[in-house]
Amino acid sequence: MSNSAVSYKPIVNIENIVATVTLEQSLDLYAMERSIPNIEYDPDQFPGLIFRLEQPKVTALIFKSGKMVVTGAKSTEELIKAVKRIIKTLKKYGIKIVGKPKIQIQNIVASANLHVNVNLDKAAFLLENNMYEPEQFPGLIFRMDDPRVVLLIFSSGKMVITGAKREDEVSKAVKRIFDKLAELDCVKPIEEEEELEL
């Protein structure tokens, strides 16, 4: 079976979105700790206040500068929903919020399964911008320029994608690496591999 017959049928999952949120105002973290339940604040240990939401399941680190780091969202939509819920909670407990929060995604971490086997030795030899030291780590590390992401590619066809700023960059990166690996004859259908074992 030639690689032109290898079909593209990945499963891609967003695992985590890390974003910064700017409120453009300073916050009284001590007042927040006193009035809002289930908040952790120990300035001797960490300068930010830890605010955990159950729905959606995210954690926000809130700093007195009015900046937040929000992590745990599985989609941009979920991230926006979480930020709105955090702001609503702050307002509910008497924290005045002026203006609209500015949200900026810093990193999207995703996983993917190409449903093919990947010849990492061959890929390491033929791909540029990669690092593959199987004695140290079983995956090939590939730095893609467009979109600007890093992919950890495993022989099972599974991978981790990090560094994306938008969800569509993840899908684009997975499609591009699949096409490149297929073009370089580095992928093999899983069925073909299983037939060889029989």
From Swiss-Prot:
GO terms for molecular function: DNA binding; DNA-binding transcription factor activity; general transcription initiation factor activity. Sequence repeats lie at residues 14-90, 105-181. InterPro entries: TBP, TBP_archaea, TBP_CS, TBP_dom_sf. Keywords: DNA-binding, Repeat, Transcription, Transcription regulation. GO terms for biological process: DNA-templated transcription initiation. It comes from the Archaea. Pfam families: TBP. Signal peptide: none annotated. The keyword Transcription applies. PANTHER family: TATA-BOX BINDING PROTEIN (PTHR10126). Belongs to the TBP family. General factor that plays a role in the activation of archaeal genes transcribed by RNA polymerase. Binds specifically to the TATA box promoter element which lies close to the position of transcription initiation. NCBIfam families: PRK00394.1-1, PRK00394.1-2. This is TATA-box-binding protein. It comes from Saccharolobus solfataricus (strain ATCC 35092 / DSM 1617 / JCM 11322 / P2). The gene is tbp.
